[in-house]
Amino acid sequence: MTEQQKFKVLADQIKISNQLDAEILNSGELTRIDVSNKNRTWEFHITLPQFLAHEDYLLFINAIEQEFKDIANVTCRFTVTNGTNQDEHAIKYFGHCIDQTALSPKVKGQLKQKKLIMSGKVLKVMVSNDIERNHFDKACNGSLIKAFRNCGFDIDKIIFETNDNDQEQNLASLEAHIQEEDEQSARLATEKLEKMKAEKAKQQDNNESAVDKCQIGKPIQIENIKPIESIIEEEFKVAIEGVIFDINLKELKSGRHIVEIKVTDYTDSLVLKMFTRKNKDDLEHFKALSVGKWVRAQGRIEEDTFIRDLVMMMSDIEEIKKATKKDKAEEKRVEFHLHTAMSQMDGIPNIGAYVKQAADWGHPAIAVTDHNVVQAFPDAHAAAEKHGIKMIYGMEGMLVDDGVPIAYKPQDVVLKDATYVVFDVETTGLSNQYDKIIELAAVKVHNGEIIDKFERFSNPHERLSETIINLTHITDDMLVDAPEIEEVLTEFKEWVGDAIFVAHNASFDMGFIDTGYERLGFGPSTNGVIDTLELSRTINTEYGKHGLNFLAKKYGVELTQHHRAIYDTEATAYIFIKMVQQMKELGVLNHNEINKKLSNEDAYKRARPSHVTLIVQNQQGLKNLFKIVSASLVKYFYRTPRIPRSLLDEYREGLLVGTACDEGELFTAVMQKDQSQVEKIAKYYDFIEIQPPALYQDLIDRELIRDTETLHEIYQRLIHAGDTAGIPVIATGNAHYLFEHDGIARKILIASQPGNPLNRSTLPEAHFRTTDEMLNEFHFLGEEKAHEIVVKNTNELADRIERVVPIKDELYTPRMEGANEEIRELSYANARKLYGEDLPQIVIDRLEKELKSIIGNGFAVIYLISQRLVKKSLDDGYLVGSRGSVGSSFVATMTEITEVNPLPPHYICPNCKTSEFFNDGSVGSGFDLPDKTCETCGAPLIKEGQDIPFETFLGFKGDKVPDIDLNFSGEYQPNAHNYTKVLFGEDKVFRAGTIGTVAEKTAFGYVKGYLNDQGIHKRGAEIDRLVKGCTGVKRTTGQHPGGIIVVPDYMDIYDFTPIQYPADDQNSAWMTTHFDFHSIHDNVLKLDILGHDDPTMIRMLQDLSGIDPKTIPVDDKEVMQIFSTPESLGVTEDEILCKTGTFGVPEFGTGFVRQMLEDTKPTTFSELVQISGLSHGTDVWLGNAQELIKTGICDLSSVIGCRDDIMVYLMYAGLEPSMAFKIMESVRKGKGLTEEMIETMKENEVPDWYLDSCLKIKYMFPKAHAAAYVLMAVRIAYFKVHHPLYYYASYFTIRASDFDLITMIKDKTSIRNTVKDMYSRYMDLGKKEKDVLTVLEIMNEMAHRGYRMQPISLEKSQAFEFIIEGDTLIPPFISVPGLGENVAKRIVEARDDGPFLSKEDLNKKAGLSQKIIEYLDELGSLPNLPDKAQLSIFDM
């Protein structure tokens, strides 16, 4: 294709062929296109036979930019072969060429008014005076020439000349003519472009290219669909359908796009790929796809060599409607038992998914009952409000009796004189109601000896299960001729007499004895009982286990054949004999004293927990539930949170208590007790739950329930108990996930917990069931009864529950008497101290503006709390750095909460208080003002002010809740935290709680582990799906690193949230909020008392030097120099392998920021603040400010760096403050600009590059935060420049963690070579090696400045701090790799007791490992220290 043909194709593509002159169309050439994929730019080089008319030129440029806007930023460079009338065209193009420069809109407007003369290749621009001439010549000469040349003009020079009267007169008519033609050209171009847009829009409507539904290729026949799991090899043509769970649309270098989607049909998953086709609207169809949509796809199955898996290369794809699960019942049920992702490592979906599904099915209400926690409540409330459904709040807890008796049926019998029958039963199962005794064995004990034995089998008249045979080693053959149980029990009762029964886990064995006695008409046994299991738990509290096997070993008793009754009995007897002696030593002498004298506060730990459902009935019930949850997590936590029955009874008001699942007390009673006892227990509850038979299938599989018939009988007994007690029986689903196919995720999570008892059995189907599904589950009860328990009773129970709101809807701040007055007085007092009694009006106006908002909105107390915390830290000798936007508040400055002064840059005289403010935006920071002396008294002036609007802190109306974040020294942080307890009281302050969920990487490990254990192979796409299913489930709890929640004195914590220990660590110093702190962020005050290295380092530098950091000059020239060159450190770039001197300087030491420094070479404080803002923002530097600076459009000081810059810049540009604030807020949140904002900015001549920059930004850093960080950084840098050893000692002590001492003690050349080698291998370095490299970079710099590192010194090294000796540093013991804090302390303590005599002595006294001793030896730290001490004759 010729270059002329290429030009025609281009003209056709951008649809302007009909608009161009025929000669130009036929003779124009597209000579080349320069493409930069990195910068997304295309530059078209076009040769034309003559100049385009100005309006055609504008049309061409607009059309080509529009056509390729989604692909790249397009520019054009024209060459005109016949430059006839160049001077005439230049005049017409003048305005357009000016627009291509980086001048401000205002200056561009001025320049366009100038007259010009074209003479050959020289363009003269007539200006008014020499000032204009110099300004224009410097500002735009080069860029204006470039703009003309890009348009095809052959121009060598542009000259700016001053006008004289003759020139003005001669050119007046020409100026008017040019202006008229410019306006006409612009109008014609605009009309043509609008016409083209309308035609294009019409064409799009006709072609339906803006698609809502994806449809590419041919329709796919449904009969060709095959399950994804059947795809196991490459195939030519396959059709599948599935739901999208991941999608990725990428643009290729060629300009085409590829869509990669992952779909599943729940048999397996597959990756599908497709490229956009030429001249098709595939991209629009790809964009119509999204996660959750069902598609039908057809294509070729092939092996993808990159992911090493089968993928489908699609030829056809269509979006389809998939039938969703419906609840078809006319009357809907209410679910009262379900678990969300907050049920730790057990539930799968978040509560929002359940609520949405229930609403879609038309359910009137839904409950949430997570295991032991209520952390889903805030999200449940939000979801219920969103979907218009009633939310029922509840929890499934662990109920325990307050004290589990050791002795039953107390007898007045002296223990040493008593006769005991130690016995054991073997049975066909665990239920004394449904299973039978097959062996009864006992020994009689008196005076510490076994005096008789009893051993009998009994015939159950049924075959034993394999489980029982394996457990007891009793076979059916052994029981064939055995007597009936009636005979055995009668004989046994007579043999026992009035002896005291003893058994291990006596409640089980006595349950079978009492049930047997009652069936024989004897009534329950009246003999005393002692349970050796509970006895051991009480008197052997140091044991972690109390099983018979374990106790036999501990007591030295032989147990030859566990789970055979006679052997278990004899072992228990010998253990019990020794226990009687233990009880005697504890003062327990009589059977009736055992429970009383051996009871303790920890009795709840011995009780076996039963599940219980607690439903909140009203607002009082919510608070009571919060109290119960808190007590169970804080006071009664033992392996799991426990709820003593007395605690539940105390706080039962407003709660409905349900029987929960098969682990509930009532279900267990049905298995172990007769009906009268079951009904007695049932009366404790407000409702009885029965769950689908499918959920109990594992009990049948594990032979805990005999069969389905027995299970149905259990249901009937539960229903009868409810009817008798007048308690509603409801069917609950015990849901752990939404749909059947989600169950695999729960299996994976359970399998990841080796100790979880659920691993012992097959997990039942626990999906969220529809009404018709539940009715079908209980069809065996009959239609009427099934409807009653599934629909009628659940709805009636839901109607008894009031609307409950778990989260407050307003902020409750603490009260401090006189806070308003104190903040006002403190602000003015410090302002007068700084600015004088006669305050400048700008100071008064700012204070009054802020105080009106702060006091008017009740925020004074927040300021006062922060002031007290900062003052305490300052009084204790630690500086505090502010974070966030608090430095935007002048009141915060005057109350000494922050050092950042947000007023415009200004001078202040420390003596006569004269001040001078710069309000025009000409100075970025007061610290950048030149040094100056007071004209009145001659004193050096103080320089202050960072020019930050107050609105960035409390919002434009000043009513946004202040978020005051403070950086305390890391070592002082615990003191600051504890000081809040002094201010408010221990029961009013809590750490802000967090919830840790399963991360994607962790979930991947779980999935891989599960598949490996099961011997299952799955392709990568299916693994990705399973990972997504497991991600986000609660794994643990934690605490915010510095967040303290303050409860006002007129409320208590339970008005907002329950409390707990982080990660259930009962030894934690602080309790946390049970809710994630974000949930209550708007209801209670959160103080961010964070720990930071900078204040700690400043404190150490102050201690070493005696220099008050507040006296350090911020504009020290040598300090400023290190941000662009290392010269002031006395080293070269080559020596330290870096072009700046900022290694180890906070905010400026990372490779990323050092590169920014190299690119920008900042010289002022305000520019350093810009760097800090640019480095912390998202899409603020890369692809944005960086390109603007590189291309010369603007410099570092004028790019957008911090969020506040936007508001200040726009106000200086003439925008109303309210609009400037709106724009700043929109941009900083990544929301871009609205049409109204863009229009307003253009009206005020804001340049296009500024608008473009705003549109790219995703997140911005507050200027106050950046200023506070830079202030700390500059102070630390001051020590680096002027007091090097103090700096290096502090840096290595405070900030460094990984050391290579072997390298660090070498000469500077060796250290440099090591650093250089690590740079060459950087991409292969692990995290630890990269941390070591950071330390070696600093060490290399230190060495080239003439200082060195000594080896560890046994005599001089400290535990944790680097110390200075001459021009060297001595490292501490903690710097030795692998040596921990305790060992470091121990070495110093041992050294204080006397010198180490040998390496063996060092090992014994300090506990050093051989590996560390060898390291110290290699380091040269153990000179002349022998391996073993030599005994001298003089020591004898």
Curated annotation (Swiss-Prot):
Reaction(s) catalysed by this chain's protein: DNA(n) + a 2'-deoxyribonucleoside 5'-triphosphate = DNA(n+1) + diphosphate
Domain of life: Bacteria
Keyword RNA-binding: no
Ranges where the Exonuclease domain occurs: 420-576
Localization in the cell: Cytoplasm
Entry keyword set: Cytoplasm, DNA replication, DNA-directed DNA polymerase, Exonuclease, Hydrolase, Nuclease, Nucleotidyltransferase, Transferase
Single GO MF descriptor: DNA-directed DNA polymerase activity
GO cellular component: cytoplasm
Signal peptide extent: none
EC number(s) from the headed UniProt entry: 2.7.7.7
Gene3D superfamilies: 1.10.150.870, 3.30.1900.20, 6.10.140.1510, Metal-dependent hydrolases, Nucleic acid-binding proteins, PolC, middle finger domain, Ribonuclease H-like superfamily/Ribonuclease H
Biological process (GO), any one: DNA-templated DNA replication
Keyword Hydrolase among record annotations: yes
Protein family: Belongs to the DNA polymerase type-C family. PolC subfamily.
UniProt xrefs under PANTHER family: DNA POLYMERASE III POLC-TYPE, DNA POLYMERASE III SUBUNIT ALPHA
Function of the molecule: Required for replicative DNA synthesis. This DNA polymerase also exhibits 3' to 5' exonuclease activity.
Protein name as it appears in the record: DNA polymerase III PolC-type
